[in-house]
Every structure is written in structure tokens, then in C-alpha cells.
């Protein structure tokens, strides 16, 4: 059963990915590290107060499981409350509430395995695929990954 409790996380990094998307990294407190251990392809539900209202959205983790910082990519959506906040307002040092990682879009990885993986993604749907590919290539260096990607 997925945990439904939110934990305060500090924004550790922000970097533009495109003209309408940012990558946001989080500092995970030592006391929460086990709860926030993630598998490739999982997502975070992030919550913040916007205009006096609590707004939460889910975003795919785009970092690999061995990356030093957990990151999500957030694409701006016209009229999107949280996506515009993330792209325009949020800054390093801000605190947002996050649920521990959830989701099952991942393969069980094991060092020494030699498998073939095929991913098909379009647009911002690439974010969980990036996490999977990075993790596969690190954990199973003999495996082969093929990506079919389409974008406007």
C-alpha cells in the first residue's frame, strides 16, 4: 500500500531543460532517506500552497537510482497552477511537501543480467523512461536499450 503522508523537502537545484520545462532536485533529509529510496520510473506527488490553496501534482522522477540527487522534470502547461509555479517562482531553498515515490513503471534490475529493453515515449512522457534507461545502463551494463522517441 502506498504511503499517503507528505514530508517537507528542500529544493536543492533548479535547471532549465527547455524553454518550457525545468528540472528540480530535492535534498532528502537523512531521517527520510529510506522512505524516499526509489526505483526507476516512479513519481513524486508534490504539494505547495499557491494563492492560499493547497495544490498537489505528480511528476515523474527523471534521475537514475544512483544519481546523487533525486530530480523531477516539470513541463509548463497553459493555465497550470503548479507547472507555472515550478517554472516561474520556485527557487533553491524553498520547501515543498512530497509523498514518498510511488509507481511501478520499472524492471527488476540485477548486475550481470544481459537483457534487451525497448522504450517508446513521446513528449514529456520521456521523463520516467530517462530514469529507467540511466538505471539500466548503470546496473546492467551488458543489457541493450532501444528508445523510440517522438516530439513536436
Language-model segments: what does each one mean?
Residues 2, 84-152:
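FNR/FR-type flavoprotein reductase catalytic core
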Residues 2-95, 99, 115, 151-152:
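Ferredoxin-reductase
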Amino acid at each position: 500500500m502506498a504511503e499517503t503522508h507528505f514530508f517537507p523537502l528542500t529544493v536543492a537545484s533548479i535547471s532549465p531543460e527547455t524553454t518550457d520545462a525545468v528540472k528540480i532536485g530535492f535534498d532528502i533529509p537523512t531521517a527520510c532517506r529510506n522512505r524516499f529510496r526509489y526505483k526507476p520510473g516512479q513519481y513524486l506527488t508534490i504539494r505547495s500552497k499557491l494563492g492560499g490553496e493547497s495544490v498537489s501534482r505528480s511528476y515523474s522522477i527523471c534521475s537514475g537510482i544512483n544519481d546523487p540527487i533525486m530530480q523531477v522534470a516539470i513541463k509548463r502547461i497553459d493555465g497550470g497552477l503548479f507547472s507555472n509555479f515550478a517554472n516561474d517562482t520556485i527557487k533553491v531553498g524553498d520547501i515543498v511537501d512530497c509523498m514518498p515515490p510511488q509507481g511501478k513503471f520499472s524492471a527488476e534490475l540485477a548486475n550481470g543480467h544481459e537483457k534487451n529493453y525497448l522504450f517508446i515515449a513521446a513528449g514529456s512522457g520521456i521523463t520516467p523512461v530517462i530514469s529507467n534507461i540511466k538505471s539500466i545502463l548503470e546496473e546492467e551494463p551488458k543489457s541493450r536499450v532501444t528508445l523510440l522517441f517522438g516530439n513536436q
